């Protein structure tokens, strides 16, 4: 679907905000959405994706004033709730954008510039809810970068490309492949979510096929 839907006219048709704080804001300039997230927030694309998938979008973390924090240009993909595989929204109110509650989902997760822009990490979540309260049950880090070249630059527009093909999962940022993961039990369907926390971000040019 080449319709990005990141404008005021189409936004609610294609996207759904799941936010820990009721005080989040989404504003639009043309086909670019700006998200101010005081706490954890997932911007879910409403369509379920399946099979061979390529997702692309442009995004940046805005740092222009005192309250802006350079951190967390993250995303979920092939996300689903094992308890309700065909309905991601069934427990949306319970998840409520809270990061810990996302351990209840199966998904691939890339956190770019997480932990106050000190880490970039890739994980595969298996939907084990015990991870919500038990750190030892949380999914392993499958790939990690901590060097400055793989952390966020302020106000820089990144081009992100994600591919899922058979059992191979790849994540590219500005043309560099950060993740090349072969999954013994690949997640073949699910939803995409743009994820951030305590930040001001912009996203545009979203497409998938």
Model features per residue range: what roles?
Residues 1-209:
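Extracellular glycan-recognition regions
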């Amino acid at each position: 679907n080449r319709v990005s839907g990141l404008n005021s006219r189409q936004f609610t048709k294609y996207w759904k905000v799941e936010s820990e704080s009721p005080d989040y804001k989404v504003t639009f300039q043309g086909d670019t959405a700006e998200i101010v997230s005081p706490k954890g927030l997932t911007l879910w694309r409403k369509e379920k994706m399946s099979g061979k998938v390529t997702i692309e979008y442009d995004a940046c973390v805005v740092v222009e004033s005192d309250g802006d924090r350079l951190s967390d240009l993250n995303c979920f993909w092939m996300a689903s709730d094992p308890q309700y595989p065909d309905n991601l929204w069934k427990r949306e109110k319970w998840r409520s954008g809270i990061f810990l509650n996302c351990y209840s989902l199966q998904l691939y997760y890339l956190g770019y510039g997480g932990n106050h822009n000190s880490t970039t990490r890739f994980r595969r979540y298996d939907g084990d809810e015990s991870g919500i309260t038990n750190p030892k049950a949380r999914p392993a880090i499958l790939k990690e970068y901590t060097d400055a070249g793989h952390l966020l630059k302020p106000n820089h527009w990144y081009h992100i490309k994600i591919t899922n093909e058979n059992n191979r999962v790849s994540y590219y940022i500005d043309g560099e492949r950060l993740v090349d993961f072969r999954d013994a039990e690949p997640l073949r369907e699910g939803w995409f979510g743009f994820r951030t926390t305590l930040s001001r971000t912009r996203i545009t040019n979203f497409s998938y096929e």
